Amino acid sequence: MEKMINDIAHRIIAGGSITEAEAIQLTQVQGTEVYDLFRAATRVKEHFVGNEVHLCSIINAKSGRCAENCAFCAQSAHHKTDAPVYPLVQEEEMLASARMAETNGSACFGIITSGTTVNGPELEQILTALRRIRKETTILPSCSLGIIDEETARKLKEAGMDTYHHNLETAASFFPQICTTHDYQDDVNTVRAVKKAGVKVCCGGIFGLGESAAQRVEMALTLKDLDVDSVPMNFLNPIEGTRLEGAANITAQECLKTIAIYRLILPGKRITVCGGREKNLRDLQSWIFFAGANGTMIGNYLTTLGRNVDTDLTMFSDLGLKTVMCAH
């Protein structure tokens, strides 16, 4: 297995690619072979994207009462959880959060809203906030506003949005087990519309939903076909009141193996570890960078708390990682 892993890394660095069958086979590595996989992912990462780490932060700008029935989500109106419920926050609050993210060293700041989409006055308010963030900070703003079309993407871009975030969440073959209120193709179409508008796309998913290892590979190959710019990787933090409240936690080793395989499938992309990092990786959080990740979210998530920012910044320094600074 060590020879196979090394051969795959050499092939990728030389401009080739890993096959689906090889990627699925790598999901089964155990023992010391896991470290061979991590070494290969690190070599590929350093060849294609270097040794810098990209930091991002978000604001939950509109929370709760979402009509979608995503099995993992605390904000779904189909679930009874303790997640906060409030309308779209004012632009001043978005701007203040962007400034805080900038102070903490994030290069990207995401405005995230619950619900299927945004339009009308809400969209106009977000457009105004984007213009102010661009004018009054150096941070790059992104948005995650649900399913949108090319015209909306162009409006957001003109207002200053750098990247649009829209997760596929899981593989197409598993999606009906997670969400039935919209089709997988709606998400794929959103990614394509945003790309057509000339906007960078941040698109990934969440692991530990009950999907198979092969389905994790399936989603990675879909992301490769869509040619997304960055891939956020979340790991399920089961929330009481959701359909997945009793789901078994994904192991730390499974998290790291999945990151490594995604690096081999998506060698030149930004791979950012986001939600569930603290819950699932615990003392192994720093290992994400040895498994192939080159980004992480700092601060809090949508409905769960993140780790202390200073603790994360110390971790990056201890690892000798250089953080990417904000720049328009």
From Swiss-Prot:
Cofactor note: Binds 1 [4Fe-4S] cluster. The cluster is coordinated with 3 cysteines and an exchangeable S-adenosyl-L-methionine. Binds 1 [2Fe-2S] cluster. The cluster is coordinated with 3 cysteines and 1 arginine.
InterPro entries: Aldolase_TIM, BATS_dom, Biotin_synth/BioAB, Biotin_synthase, Elp3/MiaA/NifB-like_rSAM, rSAM
Keywords (A to Z) from UniProt: 2Fe-2S, 4Fe-4S, Biotin biosynthesis, Iron, Iron-sulfur, Metal-binding, S-adenosyl-L-methionine, Transferase
Known cofactor(s): [4Fe-4S] cluster; [2Fe-2S] cluster
One Pfam family matching this protein: BATS
Catalytic activity: (4R,5S)-dethiobiotin + (sulfur carrier)-SH + 2 reduced [2Fe-2S]-[ferredoxin] + 2 S-adenosyl-L-methionine = (sulfur carrier)-H + biotin + 2 5'-deoxyadenosine + 2 L-methionine + 2 oxidized [2Fe-2S]-[ferredoxin]
Binding locations of [2Fe-2S] cluster: 142, 202
Pathway annotation: Cofactor biosynthesis; biotin biosynthesis; biotin from 7,8-diaminononanoate: step 2/2
Residues holding [4Fe-4S] cluster: 66, 70, 73
GO MF term (any one): biotin synthase activity
A GO biological-process term: biotin biosynthetic process
SMART domains from the UniProt entry: BATS (SM00876), Elp3 (SM00729)
Domain Radical SAM core: 48-277
EC number: 2.8.1.6
Subunit structure: Homodimer.
Protein family per UniProt: Belongs to the radical SAM superfamily. Biotin synthase family.
Biological role: Catalyzes the conversion of dethiobiotin (DTB) to biotin by the insertion of a sulfur atom into dethiobiotin via a radical-based mechanism.
Matches recorded under NCBIfam families: bioB
Protein name: Biotin synthase
Lineage per the UniProt record: Bacteria, Pseudomonadati, Thermodesulfobacteriota, Desulfuromonadia, Geobacterales
